[in-house]
A protein has these predicted regions:
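ATP-dependent small-molecule kinase phosphotransfer cores
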Residues: 43-105
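Hydrophobic anchor at the beta1->P-loop junction of P-loop NTPases
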Residues: 16, 110
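Hydrophobic positions on the alpha1 helix immediately C-terminal to the Walker A/P-loop
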Residues: 27
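Conserved lysine of the Walker
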Residues: 24
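Post-Walker A helix-loop "phosphate-sensing" segment adjacent to the P-loop in P-loop NTPases
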Residues: 33-43
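P-loop (Walker A) phosphate-binding loop of NTP-binding proteins
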Residues: 19
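Small-molecule kinase domains that catalyze NTP-dependent phosphoryl transfer to phosphate-bearing small molecules
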Residues: 93, 123-125, 131-185
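Short, Lys/Arg-enriched N-terminal segments with co-localized hydrophobic residues
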Residues: 1-5
Length: 185
């Protein structure tokens, strides 16, 4: 089967990183909307997607944000999967996903990088990678959750092309995102 969709598109890849509740998902939606308005196909991918799928089966989580078992997800992802099974488990899955989706999408947005290697490995592997650091408020986490490695590993990591401080209205945030995207080629 041949056609445009079977040719690798060499997509722009955005790697979004920041603490929980900093606005990563909202910013991702703005990026998708921006490119879709230019008739380009955009998709968001999450390192945490497989963890969430495991949680749905293991503890019958309903998948809703309001009932998110954050402690369980942190333990499953770090203590079991990264520490006991494969330190690059999620990165390898993401790289495989990028390879597949590169045939179908012009823009790929990784919405939830939490560790240095989750940013650096895609950055080194692909040609058009834009790293965006998000700073915002994560005050609704417990102290234990705030101290988890997935919340602290990037505290002193400042490798990025763009930084967004999410401290205003949604309209202001959208303007910040659009200004960045106007610069990206």
């Amino acid at each position: 089967m041949k056609g445009d969709f079977m040719e690798k598109k060499n997509p722009i890849i955005f790697v979004i990183y920041g603490k929980a509740r900093s606005g990563k998902s909202t910013i991702t939606e703005y990026i998708k909307e921006y490119y879709q308005n230019k008739n380009l196909k955009a998709i968001d991918l999450m390192y945490a997607e497989s963890i969430k799928n495991y949680a749905k089966k293991i503890i019958n989580w309903d998948g809703k944000e309001e009932t998110k078992p954050r402690d369980f997800l942190q333990q499953l992802g770090t203590e079991i999967i990264r520490n006991q099974i494969d330190g690059n488990f999620f990165i390898n899955r993401m790289l495989q996903d990028i390879e597949v989706y590169s045939y179908f999408y012009d823009v790929i947005i990784i919405t939830d990088a939490r560790l240095k290697q989750e940013i650096e490995i895609p950055y080194k592997k692909y040609e058009k990678v834009i790293r965006i650091k998000i700073e915002g408020n994560n005050s609704d986490l417990t102290d234990k959750q705030k101290q988890h490695i997935t919340e602290t590993a990037l505290n002193n990591y400042d490798e990025y092309e763009y930084k967004i401080i999410n401290n205003g209205t949604l309209e202001q945030l959208k303007n910040k995102v659009n200004n960045i995207l106007d610069e990206v080629k």
